[in-house]
């Protein structure tokens, strides 16, 4: 009998495997990304203190007013720019990118490129 692969379970396995190797410090916190069907979320986390330093999502008014639909690449790029702008204001310029088990493609790639354009280094 054939079984269809559970994509989210596979993503979680990839995420666990990557998280064993990646952790954010106070010098280089972790830029963590979560993607749903309709929105995208990004957080900058200091894993040593277990504190979220900066967060942004496509649910914020600044992003919602700039795009028609919040679940596309355009919205992801705006979220990347927004999280980078907030991070630079707090003095964070270098991060470790945690793609959350997602492939570096589409919305995840756009978020990363938007964050890089706005001043984050990773």
Swiss-Prot record:
One of its GO terms (cellular component) is cytosolic large ribosomal subunit. Keywords: Ribonucleoprotein, Ribosomal protein, RNA-binding, rRNA-binding. It comes from Clostridioides difficile (strain 630) (Peptoclostridium difficile). Residues 1-24 are annotated as: Disordered. The lineage of its organism: Bacteria, Bacillati, Bacillota, Clostridia, Peptostreptococcales. The keyword Ribonucleoprotein applies. It comes from the Bacteria. This is Large ribosomal subunit protein uL18. The gene is rplR. Transmembrane segments: none annotated. This is one of the proteins that bind and probably mediate the attachment of the 5S RNA into the large ribosomal subunit, where it forms part of the central protuberance. GO terms for biological process: translation. HAMAP family: Ribosomal_uL18_B (MF_01337_B). Belongs to the universal ribosomal protein uL18 family.
